[in-house]
Amino acid sequence: MELDEIKVFGRWSTKDVVVKDPGLRNYINLTPIYVPHTAGRYTKRQFEKAKMNIVERLVNKVMRREENTGKKLKALKIVENAFEIIEKRTKQNPIQVLVDAIENAGPREDTTRISYGGIVYLQSVDCSSLRRIDVALRNIALGAYMAAHKSKKPIEEALAEEIIAAARGDMQKSYAVRKKEETERVAQSAR
């Protein structure tokens, strides 16, 4: 007897998802999982979160805002409904669209503050792959909440639109891509 393939939310396969960016390949975890909920198993050590499924990391970022703090089931439903909308609009695997959005929304360069002789100035530094993913997921979730705040648009639709726009690299529609470009522009001026 052959076992069925394990799919995220019982619908979407991670088997055909391709990570194009070689720097992010080791840090975007696409292991098949029914429900992306590991109950903090990978938070004990420094780089353990690279072992966490990328969908669960998105769910955890969605869960951070005021009204959703600690409500993981609500965040899981938001992400699942957003994935349904993405699948209807793009006719693609929503996990592949999410991976493309992370690749386009993660900044490659950032700045750090350096104090030298009492004078503080910014110095351009390269971003690590793990930080690129963290910043991209945070900005995608933040952009969705900003689009849904004080509007009739539900959060699921706002999250789906943000992920689709970030996957296309659309600066006009995606908050995450705009923030990435702004961060890289500031870093370039601080070289």
Curated annotation (Swiss-Prot):
Superkingdom as given in the UniProt entry: Archaea
GO biological process, one term: ribosomal small subunit assembly
Keyword terms of this UniProt record: Ribonucleoprotein, Ribosomal protein, RNA-binding, rRNA-binding
GO terms of molecular function: mRNA binding; rRNA binding; structural constituent of ribosome
InterPro entries, per database record: Ribosomal_uS7, Ribosomal_uS7_arc, Ribosomal_uS7_CS, Ribosomal_uS7_dom, Ribosomal_uS7_dom_sf, Ribosomal_uS7_euk/arc
Annotated Gene Ontology cellular component terms: cytosolic small ribosomal subunit; ribosome
Function: One of the primary rRNA binding proteins, it binds directly to 16S rRNA where it nucleates assembly of the head domain of the 30S subunit. Is located at the subunit interface close to the decoding center.
Family assignment from sequence similarity: Belongs to the universal ribosomal protein uS7 family.
NCBIfam families: PRK04027.1 (NF003106), uS7_euk_arch (TIGR01028)
Subunit structure: Part of the 30S ribosomal subunit.
Protein name from the UniProt record: Small ribosomal subunit protein uS7
Originating species: Methanocaldococcus jannaschii (strain ATCC 43067 / DSM 2661 / JAL-1 / JCM 10045 / NBRC 100440) (Methanococcus jannaschii)
Species lineage: Archaea, Methanobacteriati, Methanobacteriota, Methanomada group, Methanococci
Gene (UniProt): rps7
